Amino acid sequence: MALPTFSMRQLIEAGCHFGHNTRRWNPKMAPYLYGQRDNVHIIDLQQTVPMLYRAMQAVRDVTAGGGRVLFVGTKRQAQDVVAEHARRCGQYYVNHRWLGGMLTNWKTISHSIKRLRDLEERFGGGDLLGLTKKEQLNLGREKDKLDMALGGIKEMGGLPDMLFIIDTVKESLAVNEANKLGLPVVAVIDSNSDPRGITYPIPGNDDAIRAIQTYCELISGAAIDGIQAQLGAAGVDVGAAEIVPAETLAAEAPAAEQQPTA
């Protein structure tokens, strides 16, 4: 069991060093910028490498302690990648519009998740007798809408222990809610980002698909390493184990062997 490895060359090949046009920058990002080329800011990957590794260690510590990590990326080029890698490591995701209060008003969100489950049971069990085609169509649309918004967190069972965010400008609501609740945030910060409020910043390109894929693979791998450590501590055969949601592991592991969340 070990954290995934990566190199600066890998980050360069993924285009992680390209920031935005120099006119679209946040001066608070100046410490993380190497310079500019053709009116585009170049991010200092010599800082990114250790900061990315530190973020991976933090994610690993959370999942090793049975904690939950919420992946957030609603921009078009991040949606599929975020969902894929959150599922890969048995974690959770929001890859469509962030609903205001998704964290700070969890009670209301929980009611919406219950409604989604009820609708899924009705459709799955064929419990639609007595409904007109129009009523069935309307319920189907409601289910699809709820699933798009909440499908990635319907198994989360409570607030996450950490957020991993792609594009803090677009996901400013998520950052603000996490800060309000004191939840640690791992996030990719581009040249137009505000690094304030980010517990574990990762300076890098948050627009290129290859860059997003690289971050998500590494963070997902770190989460898996933590889960494997927890399974090993609980005496589970890691080689035969299947990655399952974190709260399931926490429920099954002996209480004395669960490690505190970082």
From Swiss-Prot:
GO BP terms: namely: translation
- Extract one GO cellular component term from the record: cytosolic small ribosomal subunit
Write down the PROSITE patterns for this protein, in alphabetical order: RIBOSOMAL_S2_2 (PS00963)
Q: Which UniProt keywords apply?
A: Ribonucleoprotein, Ribosomal protein
Query: Which CDD domains does the protein's record reference?
Result: RPS2
Does the entry annotate any disulfide bonds, and if so which pairs? none
Output the InterPro entries linked to this UniProt entry: Ribosomal_uS2 (IPR001865), Ribosomal_uS2_bac/mit/plastid (IPR005706), Ribosomal_uS2_CS (IPR018130), Ribosomal_uS2_flav_dom_sf (IPR023591)
Q: Which SUPFAM superfamilies match?
A: Ribosomal protein S2
Q: Which GO terms describe its molecular function?
A: structural constituent of ribosome
> Per its UniProt record, what Gene3D superfamilies does this chain match?
Glucose-6-phosphate isomerase like protein, domain 1, Helix hairpin bin
What is the annotated signal peptide range for this record? none
Family membership, please give it: Belongs to the universal ribosomal protein uS2 family.
Specify the protein name. Answer: Small ribosomal subunit protein uS2
Organism of derivation: Rhodospirillum rubrum (strain ATCC 11170 / ATH 1.1.1 / DSM 467 / LMG 4362 / NCIMB 8255 / S1)
Which lineage?
Bacteria, Pseudomonadati, Pseudomonadota, Alphaproteobacteria, Rhodospirillales
